[in-house]
Amino acid sequence: MTDDYEHYEAVVVGAGPGGAAAAAALARNDVETLVLERGVEAGSKNVSGGLIYAEESAPYTIADLFPGFREEASEREVTESYIHNIAGNRKKTFDLEGIHHHDTEWCDAVLRRKMDAWLAEQVHEMTRQTGGGVLEGVRVNGLLREDGEIVGVTTDELDPIRADLIVGADGVNSELARDAGLMDWEEPDEWFQGVKAVVDMPSDVIEERFDVPADGGASHLFSGDLFEGVRGGGFLYTNEDSLSIGTVFHLDSLAAERAEPQELLNNLLRHPLLDQWLQGEYTELEYSAKLVPDSKKVAHPSPHRGRLLVVGDAAGQMQAQGPIIKGMNHAVTAGGLAAEAFQEAKTRGDKHLAGQLYEQKLTEEGVMKKLRPRRYRWTRALTENGVVDGINKAVINSPLGTAGLKVFGGLTERAFNSPFLLGMIPDT
């Protein structure tokens, strides 16, 4: 009988940003919360590193939930952002200041291994006070059901655990979302393939070569023919004493072009544009690869089933539209809203309302509007056939020369910095 199993008011599966946010918000409301993390140490299973935004419009930011986050867990504040469109040996650089600072309170570069480990420490202290805590090295493999109703989770290492609320923050390969029938994105065009290298560089060298202050950093994005016709692009983020350099491509485009992500990343690392910063040599500290969902197609409008609420990559909440790449902040918002929905359902006297309230809050707070812009449906066919890349390449090689670059380049820069237009032309 399931009555014999250990019970917690809330079980959070996954200790990344979304799970940590949910656990912190639950603990603040004195909800007995147990966090189960698959990695032997939080962050050890996560290979990503990127930018985390604090959006002015968001009801939750990671620094709100975790005081001291920016001082202890992030790398550099990213104050400058550019995109470089490359055609052969020519390039055109566009300043992304407008879109980077749009709705932005702050933006920091982070390394997930460091960040997740710090978050787990904070979450353990918070949840321990509620009678819960964080258990690492536990793989959750599915949902516990009783008479067809979801009542808890099952694991490889422990007996099943019952809960009134289950937050699935277990990533893009979520066992819980699949078991509940919520993960329905199976086609290659619904995924991005990301690869990343972390390159060693002393902090003073970063500041000199990128012309940034000691408390500042930069983001550089790359698109063009160095990626051999594969839809997607590259990125470079300045960390405290390293660089995160990587590429993100549509999985179906990689397959169609029979391209290897590692080779395309090498094309970027060897390009003369990067040599101005790497100066002929670099030491890779880490190499990693990851699949991420394309929210424009798969962000689940109803990411819940019974007692299960899913957040972050498990719910397809990864926003990639042109130069906008946001995932961690949406996971944090979703985690906070999931906890808020549960607390509100408790107050109403019916915990089963949590999923419905969570879905409602995602819409009311504008999260779904960002993840699945309606305008994208109008232009999907155009944007997924390389038209935008072709326009940018034509601009760079324009027979009008410098005058053409100034005129058409200015229009392109304005488009890159327009949230409205990026909702229609998301893929560069």
Locations of regions flagged by a protein language model:
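N-terminal Rossmann-like FAD-binding beta1-loop-alpha1 element of flavoenzymes
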Residues: 5-35
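N-terminal FAD cofactor-binding segment of flavoenzymes
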Residues: 39-88
